[in-house]
Amino acid sequence: MAKPIPKIGSRRNGRISSRKSARKIPKGVIHVQASFNNTIVTVTDVRGRVVSWASAGTCGFRGTKRGTPFAAQTAAGNAIRTVVEQGMQRAEVMIKGPGLGRDAALRAIRRSGILLSFVRDVTPMPHNGCRPPKKRRV
């Protein structure tokens, strides 16, 4: 009979206090992923560990409203509000995707008071890789 493998750590008893409030982050990276259907804003520290995130869907927007610039602005504001309280002053911004929320999210980040060291477009561009899907006929 095989021995049961003991659990090393479970999620329930792992954390006693909130880790997010304990960390002080002076510098971070803000990732904005803007698709036509949604905008996701993730704030990480310089090592890549996620500190805060928000999307248009988590901000209460549903359906086609998630792809709007206003939804992206709200998502960026919600994600950044928590890290400003933790003491973030400088950030780099990585924008990915062709969505409508790119500029609106960047505008909300600029208004938050965080100094931006650079803004980089990291949208993946194929060097003629995969064949695209066929054109829609409506």
Swiss-Prot record:
Its main location: plastid. HAMAP family: Ribosomal_uS11. Component of the chloroplast small ribosomal subunit (SSU). Mature 70S chloroplast ribosomes of higher plants consist of a small (30S) and a large (50S) subunit. The 30S small subunit contains 1 molecule of ribosomal RNA (16S rRNA) and 24 different proteins. The 50S large subunit contains 3 rRNA molecules (23S, 5S and 4.5S rRNA) and 33 different proteins. uS11c interacts with bS21c. One of its GO terms (cellular component) is ribonucleoprotein complex. Signal peptide: none annotated. This is Small ribosomal subunit protein uS11c. Residues 1-24 are annotated as: Disordered. It is found in: Plastid, Chloroplast. Keywords: Chloroplast, Plastid, Ribonucleoprotein, Ribosomal protein, RNA-binding, rRNA-binding. The gene is rps11. Component of the chloroplast ribosome (chloro-ribosome), a dedicated translation machinery responsible for the synthesis of chloroplast genome-encoded proteins, including proteins of the transcription and translation machinery and components of the photosynthetic apparatus. InterPro entries: Ribosomal_uS11, Ribosomal_uS11_bac-type, Ribosomal_uS11_CS, Ribosomal_uS11_sf. GO terms for molecular function: rRNA binding; structural constituent of ribosome. Belongs to the universal ribosomal protein uS11 family. It comes from Spinacia oleracea (Spinach). GO terms for biological process: translation. PANTHER family: 40S RIBOSOMAL PROTEIN S14/30S RIBOSOMAL PROTEIN S11. SUPFAM superfamilies: Translational machinery components. Residues 9-24 have a biased composition (Basic residues). It comes from the Eukaryota.
